[in-house]
Amino acid sequence: MPTIQQLIRHERQTLKAKTKSPALRACPERRGVCTRVYTSTPKKPNSALRKVARVRLTSGFEVTAYIGGIGHNLQEHSVVLIRGGRVKDLPGVRYHIIRGTLDTAGVKDRRQSRSKYGAKAPKE
């Protein structure tokens, strides 16, 4: 605990909030190129093969991004758009790949929450 005299000499410094998605550099999205597309297993107690990609961004960072939805068409050298948002059961995955933009196709036969997966409206 500082004395009043110490506080007069040096005022308290405000804590700066640390960003949860530093690779975006204060942008809503960033473009990048997939360097590796693979599956990863989640932390306990969950069990699955989650689809993830290693992406080299235009900001110079190389990050791991999650590929949401059922099925995808991504491979090495695919150009993708990523957004922030972590995956709770995959350590180190702090970004999501946006479906339906650039080289990423939307999810086929998706009827609900279509805007999140880049799916077009179904033909009546």
Swiss-Prot record:
It comes from Synechococcus sp. (strain CC9311). Gene3D superfamilies: Nucleic acid-binding proteins. InterPro entries: NA-bd_OB-fold, Ribosomal_uS12, Ribosomal_uS12_bac. The gene is rpsL. Residues 104-124 are annotated as: Disordered. Keywords: Methylation, Ribonucleoprotein, Ribosomal protein, RNA-binding, rRNA-binding, tRNA-binding. This is Small ribosomal subunit protein uS12. Transmembrane segments: none annotated. GO terms for molecular function: rRNA binding; structural constituent of ribosome; tRNA binding. Pfam families: Ribosom_S12_S23 (PF00164).
